[in-house]
């Protein structure tokens, strides 16, 4: 309909007007921040693996302000150093998760870019992205089932570690050190394309908790039974 067409046109306009190459700051990488007040002070490069793959895809395919393929290979892929042999629970991560190389990072990394990208169709010299996101979700599930920190509630029906509100403020929950006993419903539920059976069990369990984790706008951001 006309409303949908108008939305598509606006999105297309934003993409074409975005000066992606500006965010390289003369380097072979894309930087996360630039501010008219602070310039490049933060100086934080977008390097994989995390949630930012789609930035490089949009930037490289821009018809107006593209970045070169070398920015992807030297920036996102860190000159090939993005590859890893880590395989928690026998599941190869394929790509080195920033700050969580052995067990994998927060699950939103398997979700955000793939709202707009079909991971089944993305494969390069570094990884098959379907395997990357599926194994990420499965390893998170198996970690929660194993529950090495013995938190109350974790198990086959209650799993999912990702960034959310936490016991105190915000935390990027993930297996290992950043596992704080907090389950974030979006982690398991947004993984439905990768883990349909495991995610359905989680959905039914979350639903059974009733209004203890459900409010006006749906499931609460996070909860802890510990």
Positions of PLM-derived features:
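Ser/Thr/Asn(+Pro)-rich, low-complexity disordered segments
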Residues: 1-226
């Amino acid at each position: 309909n006309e409303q949908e067409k108008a939305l598509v046109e606006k999105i297309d306009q934003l993409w074409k007007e975005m000066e992606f190459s500006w965010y390289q700051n003369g380097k072979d990488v894309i930087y996360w921040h630039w501010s008219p007040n602070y310039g490049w002070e933060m100086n934080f490069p977008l390097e994989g693996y995390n949630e930012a793959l789609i930035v490089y895809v949009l930037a490289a395919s821009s018809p107006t302000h593209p970045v070169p393929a070398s920015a992807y290979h030297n920036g996102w892929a860190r000159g090939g150093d993005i590859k890893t042999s880590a395989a928690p629970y026998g599941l190869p991560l394929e790509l080195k998760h920033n700050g969580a190389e052995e067990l994998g990072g927060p699950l939103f990394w398997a979700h955000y870019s793939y709202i707009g990208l079909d991971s089944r169709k993305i494969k390069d010299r570094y990884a098959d992205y379907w395997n990357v996101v599926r194994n990420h979700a499965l390893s998170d599930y198996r970690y929660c089932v194993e529950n090495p920190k013995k938190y109350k509630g974790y198990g086959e029906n209650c799993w999912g570690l990702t960034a959310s509100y936490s016991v105190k403020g915000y935390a990027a929950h993930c297996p290992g050190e950043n596992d704080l006993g907090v389950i974030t419903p979006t982690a398991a539920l947004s993984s439905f394309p990768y883990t349909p059976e495991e995610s359905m069990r989680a959905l039914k369990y979350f639903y059974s908790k009733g209004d203890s984790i459900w409010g006006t706008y749906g499931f609460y951001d996070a909860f802890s039974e510990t």
